[in-house]
Amino acid sequence: MAAKEIIFSEKARSRMVHGVNLLANAVKATLGPKGRHVVLDKSFGSPIITKDGVSVAKEIELADKFENMGAQMLKEVASKTNDHAGDGTTTATVLAQALIREGCKAVAAGMNPMDLKRGIDKAVIAAVTELKKISKPTSDDKAIAQVATISANSDESIGNIIAEAMKKVGKEGVITIEEGTTLENELDVVEGMQFDRGYSSPYFINNQQSQIVELDNPYILLHDKKISSVRDLLTVLDAVAKESKPLLIVAEEVEGEALATLVVNNIRGIIKVCAVKAPGFGDRRKAMLEDMAVLTGGTVISEEVGLSLEKATTSHLGKAKKVRVSKENTTIIDGIGDNDAINGRVKQIKTQIEETTSDYDREKLQERVAKLAGGVAVIKVGAATEVEMKEKKARVDDALLATRAAVEEGVIPGGGVALIRAITAISNLKGANEDQTHGIQIALRAMEAPLREIVANAGEEPSVILNKVKEGKDNFGYNAATGEFGDMVNLGILDPTKVTRSALQNAASIAGLMITTEAMVAEAPKKDEPTPPAAGGGMGGMGGMDF
């Protein structure tokens, strides 16, 4: 086992804070409408230019192991916020940096780190409650477009196209993003269905860059039981292979010998195939398989209706124009099912919605209607160069996720204003002792940081703008894009409540851990072996010769 280097207390925290500052300073340059770009070097291909906080954070790895620990923990804040809310990574990073920096200063001054953490947690819980009070539901297309525009770094064309996509497929509909072939953004709405199950084995992946499985004009086999033996599949595999078509298998489980055989055949190129676990459980799984059968014009192979897998033929299989399978989701696009049958199925489910008394069942039935009737909207991102395309696509991804978050939990005034209003509402909060109260004050000061950073990136004096915003009420704030003050909601500057809430909670979580850190352990650097002296030149007695 390699030797370890251990550092304690103030030395440990200062090294960690230095790492946090290095990462946060690179990320926070991107915050706000006048945030700057960051250029990321790639070992292959051209550099990437981005204003996406999480993309910057993911690239940073520091040489000093102790500083790197701090940077990696801060990176976790950005990643967690991105995974949960889809946006707010830079806000979370700015909040975490402010909490960690002030918290570690207080610990160095002799305060109890555990009480500081309790104070911060108390302030965050109160602030989140206040944010929920300020939050307004997102109902109209205009609000959706505004949220998407802000998240896409004030790009109105992206905001409008996302609002249009949501209008066409519904708020529960599926929206995917692809690279376009023109300079303009385009929107295509394709009939389709998505469910939350991915490929059974990564060996099915045929698009290495995106790490997904893409099948064009595939047959679709639907089965309600486990498939373990390859013997059951031979008839279907032979028939599909003869037609040189891909095959998607959706079953309760594909395992053992059957899965191994499919993987081998796929790798050898004998048949392009992908196996996926059927969504849902029990009766709901059967119902969803029936939905897929109606959508693709196939039949569910089930012993209950007298069909066995060994006797299945291509006439029992469904068909679709395209199937896309990722690690977590499967999307069936443009199934060849009969429109009358699909409409009949939708009516049947809507009748069940009216009759059910369970909220959970109603929600699941509504999801099924959305998947059957809503279709899939495809946003094709247009750009002049590949570098611009990648940057723009990342912004569209962010905007879409932020919009979904807004639909889920509502919106609050943007530009850091909601946090300032939350500070005002909880400014009299007190802890159980002096150190806890100081922890609360640290959290309240940290909540000013996003507004300060937005203003600083716009080239203005943060303290002056902050004081003016504090003097105002409700939605009054500062529009950094135009340099004007006004009602943030009327100006269309909105943030999803879920994004700000997640950013604050994740920042406080990591900050609490760092403030209470007392020791750090890392592998000790290896000492370089002394190099042996170089051999003498020439043979003895030949010193006078010139070579």
From Swiss-Prot:
One of its GO terms (cellular component) is cytoplasm. Its main location: cytoplasm. SUPFAM superfamilies: GroEL apical domain-like, GroEL equatorial domain-like, GroEL-intermediate domain like. Its EC number is 5.6.1.7. GO terms for biological process: protein refolding. Residues 535-547 have a biased composition (Gly residues). It is found in: Cytoplasm. InterPro entries: Chaperonin_Cpn60_CS, Cpn60/GroEL, Cpn60/GroEL/TCP-1, GroEL-like_apical_dom_sf, GROEL-like_equatorial_sf, TCP-1-like_intermed_sf. Signal peptide: none annotated. ATP binds at residues 30-33, 51, 87-91, 415, 479-481, 495. Residues 524-547 are annotated as: Disordered. It is an enzyme of class 5 (isomerase). One of its GO terms (molecular function) is ATP-dependent protein folding chaperone. The keyword Chaperone applies. It catalyses: ATP + H2O + a folded polypeptide = ADP + phosphate + an unfolded polypeptide. The keyword Repressor does not apply. Keywords: ATP-binding, Chaperone, Cytoplasm, Isomerase, Nucleotide-binding. It comes from the Bacteria. Together with its co-chaperonin GroES, plays an essential role in assisting protein folding. The GroEL-GroES system forms a nano-cage that allows encapsulation of the non-native substrate proteins and provides a physical environment optimized to promote and accelerate protein folding. Belongs to the chaperonin (HSP60) family. Forms a cylinder of 14 subunits composed of two heptameric rings stacked back-to-back. Interacts with the co-chaperonin GroES. This is Chaperonin GroEL. It comes from Xylella fastidiosa (strain 9a5c).
